[in-house]
């Protein structure tokens, strides 16, 4: 990569996709499924193991330092939970690496000469000391490259102590088996990167292995996987607590709502009961008032009819008595007239005929008119 390309990549990593107003680069967002989430978290095995014996080539997903910068800016404002995707990716990769390690162990067990359990334990001890020496030498070289010479010298002194222990372990291993078998190279599979290690490897070979990019890359991947598992577990626990708290708050609000609703219903029922009671009393009062009014009306109509009947009866009685009195008087007058007619003579008849009425008749009619 040229110096200009390196500067461009550095600017992308620092400022993101919109560092120079390029709209075409913003068409793909870091949230796109085509973007590698492990790359955004700086733990993609394709980047870490690039240039090693186990180079995986280019990743099938998009790798862009500018998108990583965009993600780092956005992750400060809200949680995107990309750790879960990266954890799944690394778990599948480490599972494949562990599978290769088990296959290598099985192949060694089939090809190498069988040894006793005691000899195997002594050989395992030599391997562990070799591994410790290689790690210490790699750490000393790293500290020396960083300029921390004093710490590097202290680690080299520890390396000398471990070398003495290794020499004693090799003597025990040599004395426990025949010379012909001891000269045979005993291999061991590295538990971290599944590479082969020899029992008689020198310190330089061990330092190159444990300080090499392949072994350190696998250590970085495994440590990142452990960190992601811890982060995901913490976030899931926090999410569960938030969900539980929201559920409790919702249940508390529902209980308060039910209590408030119950009190409201009780008040509503009480008011409705009072209204019904007042309405019932008012209806009863109106009914009694109406009943009394109807009773009074009936009583008044009855009395009116009674009075009318009494007046009519009295009027009829008077009419009948008057009529009876008139008929009685008339009959008496007629009887008296008949009697007087029989007693009067021709002169009286002529006078009556000339006047049309007798004096007694005229007096009777006058009396009847006055009545």
Curated annotation (Swiss-Prot):
Modification Phosphoserine, positions: 336, 363
The name this protein goes by in its record: Putative RNA-binding protein Luc7-like 1
Record family assignment: Belongs to the Luc7 family.
Coiled coil: 87-177, 220-256
Organism: Mus musculus
GO cellular component: nucleus; U1 snRNP
Compositionally biased spans, kind Basic and acidic residues: 232-257, 318-351, 361-371
Key words, A-Z: Coiled coil, Phosphoprotein
GO biological process: mRNA splice site recognition; negative regulation of striated muscle tissue development
Start-end of Basic residues biased regions: 258-317
């Amino acid at each position: 990569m040229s110096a200009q390309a390196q500067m461009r990549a550095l600017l992308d990593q620092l400022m993101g996709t919109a560092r120079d107003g390029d709209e075409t680069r913003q068409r793909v967002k870091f949230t796109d499924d085509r973007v590698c989430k492990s790359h955004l978290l700086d733990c993609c095995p394709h980047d870490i193991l690039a240039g090693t014996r186990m180079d995986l080539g280019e990743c099938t997903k998009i790798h862009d330092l500018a998108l990583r910068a965009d993600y780092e800016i956005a992750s400060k404002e809200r949680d995107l939970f990309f750790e879960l995707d990266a954890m799944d990716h690394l778990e599948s990769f480490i599972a494949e690496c562990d599978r290769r390690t088990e296959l290598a162990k099985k192949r060694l067990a089939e090809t190498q000469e069988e040894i006793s359990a005691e000899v195997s334990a002594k050989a395992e001890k030599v391997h562990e000391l070799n591994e410790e020496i290689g790690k210490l030498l790699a750490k000393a070289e790293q500290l020396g490259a960083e300029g921390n010479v004093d710490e590097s010298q202290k680690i080299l002194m520890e390396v000398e102590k471990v070398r003495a222990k290794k020499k004693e372990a090799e003597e025990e291993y040599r004395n426990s088996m025949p010379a012909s078998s001891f000269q045979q190279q005993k291999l061991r599979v590295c538990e971290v990167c599944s590479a082969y290690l020899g029992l008689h490897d020198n310190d330089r070979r061990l330092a190159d292995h444990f300080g090499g990019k392949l072994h350190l890359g696998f250590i970085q991947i495994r440590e990142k996987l452990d960190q992601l598992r811890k982060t995901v577990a913490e976030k899931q626990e926090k999410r569960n607590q938030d969900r539980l708290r929201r559920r409790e708050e919702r249940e508390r609000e529902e209980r308060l709502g039910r209590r408030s609703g119950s009190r409201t219903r009780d008040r509503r029922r009480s008011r409705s009961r009072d209204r019904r009671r007042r309405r019932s009393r008012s209806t009863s009062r109106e009914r009694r008032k109406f009943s009394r009014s109807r009773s009074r009306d009936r009583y008044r109509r009855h009395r009116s009819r009674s009075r009318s009947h009494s007046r009519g009866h009295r009027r009829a009685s008077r009419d009948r008595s008057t009529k009876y009195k008139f008929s009685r008087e008339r009959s008496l007058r007629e009887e008296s007239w008949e009697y007087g007619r029989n007693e009067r003579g021709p002169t009286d008849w002529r006078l009556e005929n000339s006047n049309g009425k007798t004096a007694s008749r005229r007096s009777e009619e006058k009396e009847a008119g006055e009545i």
